[in-house]
Curated annotation (Swiss-Prot):
It comes from Arabidopsis thaliana. This is Zinc transporter 4, chloroplastic. The gene is ZIP4. The keyword Membrane applies. Keywords: Chloroplast, Ion transport, Membrane, Plastid, Thylakoid, Transit peptide, Transmembrane, Transmembrane helix, Transport, Zinc, Zinc transport. Residues 185-206 are annotated as: Disordered. One of its GO terms (cellular component) is chloroplast thylakoid membrane. Residues 50-61, 123-218, 272-282, 340-353 are cytoplasmic.
């Protein structure tokens, strides 16, 4: 009896409970508008804030808001995407072999995290070498003897800007290699760790290398983060689009709007720190903002013929959710949380530490709580 009930559910797809096609259709338009506006606003604030003092990426307000967004992304990976992948790949509509014989969700998440590390490393290497070649060509053209003068302590050479990176002491999204360079820089002098004063000739050379690494990191981080966000946004949009239940769609509208706004804020901050040209930044922002609404539109178009409980749909959803979880968890922990919370600026500012930790836990807690409804 139980097996026949399961077979009927797998063949029929969504339950008829609370099913209302016309009401669901109208709610999907509301969802598209709400999520589009939330995502666009979230990603636009850091980009516009580059020209506004209180919203600049060097400001404490931005750092605290980014900590909240990092908590949202971390909870999205652990609580929403990994849980969703586990639910899909353990669905009784799937055959026992191989899906019940191995913990595939955790495995796919691990593979995605390791692959992200590899892409992270290779991408950083590529951009660093590209920038070093550009600098070498510039020095050769201008005369290496004049360019090679060691800069005055505390100043930065304008030729060392990476991808248009602006001067300033703001927190940068850096990875393992850039952290190593930072520690070499910090330990090369014996005093002045938090007072902003540094001594020693090695610092002039470290600044140039650190700038190249930081600029490359900003570019790579923003691109990988967008990839991770877009990959799960499509699945989220499709899931909402194929649903014909207003009871399911209503809470999803609020949850996804909240989720999209703060993911957009984190992505916008990464794009802003990478100092992309306005055209490239606009394209990346629009691509992010349109992904989930596009998924909802596609899901709405195929809702009448789509069976969310078919083996193909479940496997696709489960694998993509698990892969997205691995990417998001890696990006949140390594490139957002660790990079900022282990930085010199954070360690030297107790108030910023407290506020950032509160915002981080608050973002993770609120996003986790949304799993009750969505």
């Amino acid at each position: 009896m139980a097996s026949s009930t399961t077979k009927i559910l797998c063949d029929a797809g969504e339950s008829d409970l609370c099913r209302d096609d016309s009401a669901a259709f109208l709610l999907k338009f509301v969802a598209i508008a709400s999520i589009l506006l939330a995502g666009a606003a979230g990603v636009a604030i850091p980009l516009i804030g580059r020209n506004r003092r209180f919203l600049q990426t060097e400001g404490n307000l931005f750092v605290a808001a980014k900590a909240f967004a990092a908590g949202v992304i971390l909870a999205t990976g652990f609580v929403h995407m990994l849980a969703g992948g586990t639910e899909a790949l353990s669905n009784p509509c799937l055959p026992d072999f191989p899906w019940s014989k191995f913990p595939f969700p955790g495995f796919f998440a691990m593979v995605a995290a390791l692959a992200t590390l590899l892409v992270d490393f290779m991408g950083t290497q590529y951009y660093e070498r590209k920038q070093e070649r550009n600098q070498a060509a510039t020095e050769a053209a201008a005369g290496s003897e004049e360019i090679a003068v060691v800069p005055v302590v505390g100043e930065r050479v304008t030729d060392n800007k990476v991808f248009g990176e602006e001067d300033g002491g703001g927190i940068h999204i850096v990875g393992i290699r850039a952290h190593a360079a930072h520690h070499r820089h910090s330990h090369s002098n014996s005093h002045g760790t938090c007072d902003g004063h540094a001594h020693g000739h090695s610092h002039g050379h470290m600044h140039g290398n650190s700038d190249v690494e930081n600029g490359a990191r900003h570019v790579v981080v923003s691109q990988i983060l967008e990839l991770g966000i877009v990959s799960h946004s499509i699945i989220i949009g499709l899931s909402l689009g194929v649903s014909q239940s207003p009871c399911t769609i209503r809470p999803l509208i609020a949850a996804l709007s909240f989720h999209q706004f703060f993911e957009g804020f984190a992505l916008g901050g990464c794009i802003s720190q990478a100092q992309f040209r306005n055209k490239s930044a606009t394209i990346m922002a629009c691509f992010f903002a349109l992904t989930t609404p596009l998924g909802i539109g596609i899901g709405t178009a195929v809702a009448s013929s789509f069976n969310s409980h078919s083996p193909g749909a479940l496997v696709t959803e489960g694998i993509l959710d698990s892969l997205s979880a691995g990417i998001l968890v890696y990006m949140a922990l390594v490139d957002l949380i660790a990079a900022d919370f282990l930085s010199k600026r954070m360690s030297c500012n107790l108030r910023l530490q407290v506020v950032s930790y509160v915002m981080l836990f608050l973002g993770a807690g609120l996003m986790s709580a949304l799993a009750i409804w969505a």
